[in-house]
């Protein structure tokens, strides 16, 4: 279905052409003065320069040419040359009726040119619990992936686990100190290794920080860890078997924690999966003359003539021959191109890593790891801060585990929902339902609180504000959906089936406003996809929720005596609910049936 703004522009462009002017001047925009009109065209101002006449002479002609067009209720030429447009109620009703008939899509067509897109997000490390620093990558990445899928693209989410490097050696050496009798440490052992891991997730989460602390204080321990890392990377059997156990135990726990965030991945590949691609890639870079030695390291120049700041060379191998993050990221690109031939790879990572991605992307292009048509995109996000404006910490200044943060918000939400029920004396909700509802609303509070901000901006994580049922919050959006569900349930409780007829022309300004906001859904979704911008969806559903609540407070819906008008209202509510639910699903949360 064509976007409404394109349909309006087509009519205005036609009027420009019919009056002898270039169609390009007929482009229409949303009105920046909604008190005066709904859409506007400022093209006469620019056209006046080309056609050497006063702008209002052009705008007058266009307005005259459109005055009998059934699309418009009014077309007004305003000096010095603006064209103000109001849509006819009949036309708008036909637009929202078409949306309602297109169930599940609501006028937003899937692309006819589907692309393969890999979204690299999550950033989890094995043997370490998720903490609040992982929140933004997971939340934004999941939404970007869902937006792409909704638009009809083949989108693959990859967690890209941190499962390589010194951290593995640290775990192995600490485990050896604690359990030296394990067969994994016997170099002469040739049998099969146990299928069950020799540690639990809680043990593993204690082993790593202990080992990390020791390595900073004990040089011999650190050297042993570096040697264990080298042996693992050279393929020592026992250490490889331990790596498998570490991965299995960690991934099981990570999946559980990501599930609590309603985040899932199609791929659970890690840095270790890219290692086999490194030798061939490095050799190619040497053979083709891209890589050269500089101060003992192997590097590739990535600076360009148009650079306004210094872009250092991309280091491929350190002086001791060890690989770096850049090496692994480049090898991962090689692996992804081989396995999936993606058209785009999108990375979700802190914006402070922007230089790293500039170097990696330029190196990948220069050395031919990707074709020219492949897009490499870094969505750099800002910091989640506490009320003091500094990075979010626990009360004692530590980094908060993600599960503890979720528990804290769940408790806050449960308290509010319980109080809400007491106030309404609606005590038929069981403890189990209240807890389930609290979890759903808490997730909406966290995700909406994050996604409603432009990704690149820092934001204040304010539990009190995020969990409020009023204002621009997740709970307010859910409360609006639940209100609509309640009205529809009452309508059906009277023994009536939900209507499937046309939506009638608006009977009030608030109803027309609701229709106008609904009619922008497909254009908004296209824009959110093009700009990889979940915050555009948040801004839209907040406007839609406000438009619905304005309509709800000004109109009797179930008490409407005219049955045809009542059925039209119910149809409009069904569409509003469908659009809101589609949007929150793309944002990564859902609404309960009651609150």
Give the ranges of each region predicted by the language model.
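Generic start-of-chain signal for non-secretory N-termini
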Residues: 1-21
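NTP-dependent nucleotidyl-transfer catalytic core
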Residues: 17, 21-46, 51-595
């Amino acid at each position: 279905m064509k976007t409404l703004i394109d349909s309006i522009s087509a009519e205005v462009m036609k009027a420009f052409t019919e009056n002898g002017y270039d169609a390009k001047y007929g482009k229409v925009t949303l009105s920046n003065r909604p008190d005066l009109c709904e859409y506007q065209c400022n093209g006469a101002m620019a056209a006046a320069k080309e056609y050497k006449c006063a702008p209002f002479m052009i705008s007058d002609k266009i307005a005259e040419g459109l005055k009998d067009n059934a699309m418009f209720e009014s077309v007004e030429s305003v000096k010095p040359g603006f064209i103000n447009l109001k849509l006819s109620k009949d036309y708008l009703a036909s637009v929202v009726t078409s949306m309602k008939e297109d169930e599940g899509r609501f006028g937003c067509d899937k692309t006819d040119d589907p692309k393969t897109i890999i979204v690299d997000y999550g950033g989890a490390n094995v043997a370490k619990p998720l903490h609040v620093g992982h929140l933004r990558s997971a939340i934004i990445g999941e939404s970007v992936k869902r937006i792409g899928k909704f638009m009809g693209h083949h989108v693959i989410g990859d967690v890209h686990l941190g499962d390589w490097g010194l951290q593995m050696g640290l775990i192995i050496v600490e485990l050896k100190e604690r359990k030296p009798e394990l067969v994994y440490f016997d170099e002469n052992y040739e049998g099969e290794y146990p299928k069950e891991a020799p540690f639990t997730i809680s043990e593993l989460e204690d082993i790593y920080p202990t080992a990390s602390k020791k390595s900073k204080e004990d040089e011999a321990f650190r050297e042993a860890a570096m040697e264990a890392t080298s042996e693992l990377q050279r393929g020592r059997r026992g250490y490889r078997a331990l790596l498998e156990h570490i991965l299995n135990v960690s991934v099981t726990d990570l999946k559980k924690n990501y599930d609590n965030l309603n985040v899932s991945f199609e791929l659970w590949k890690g840095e270790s999966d890219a290692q086999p691609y490194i030798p061939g890639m490095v050799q190619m870079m040497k053979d083709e003359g891209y890589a050269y030695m500089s101060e003992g390291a192997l590097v590739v120049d990535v600076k360009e003539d148009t650079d306004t700041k210094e872009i250092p060379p991309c280091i491929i191998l350190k002086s001791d021959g060890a690989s770096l993050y850049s090496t692994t990221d480049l090898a991962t690109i090689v692996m992804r191109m081989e396995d999936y031939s993606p058209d785009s790879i999108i990375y979700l990572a802190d914006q402070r890593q922007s230089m790293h991605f500039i170097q990696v992307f330029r190196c990948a292009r220069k050395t031919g790891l990707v074709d020219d048509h492949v897009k490499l995109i870094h969505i750099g996000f800002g910091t989640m801060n506490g009320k003091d404006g500094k990075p979010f910490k626990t009360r004692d200044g530590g980094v908060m585990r993600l599960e503890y943060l979720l528990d804290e918000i769940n408790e806050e939400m449960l308290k509010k929902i319980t109080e809400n029920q007491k106030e309404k004396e609606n005590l038929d909700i069981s403890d189990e339902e209240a807890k389930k509802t609290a979890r759903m609303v808490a997730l909406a509070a966290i995700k909406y609180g994050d996604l409603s901000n432009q990704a690149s901006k820092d934001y204040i994580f304010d539990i009190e504000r995020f969990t409020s049922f009023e204002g621009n919050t997740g709970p307010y959006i859910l409360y609006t959906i639940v209100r609509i569900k309640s009205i529809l349930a009452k309508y059906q409780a009277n023994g009536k089936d939900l209507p499937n007829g046309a939506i009638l022309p608006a009977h009030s300004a608030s109803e027309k406003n609701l229709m106008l906001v609904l009619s922008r859904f497909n254009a908004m979704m296209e824009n959110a996809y093009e700009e990889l911008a979940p915050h555009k969806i948040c801004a839209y559903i907040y406007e839609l929720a406000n438009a619905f609540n304005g309509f709800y407070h000004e109109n009797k819906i179930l008490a409407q005596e005219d049955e045809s008008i009542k059925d039209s209202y119910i149809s409009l509510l069904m569409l509003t609910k469908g659009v809101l639910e589609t949007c929150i699903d793309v944002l990564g949360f859902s609404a309960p049936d009651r609150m």
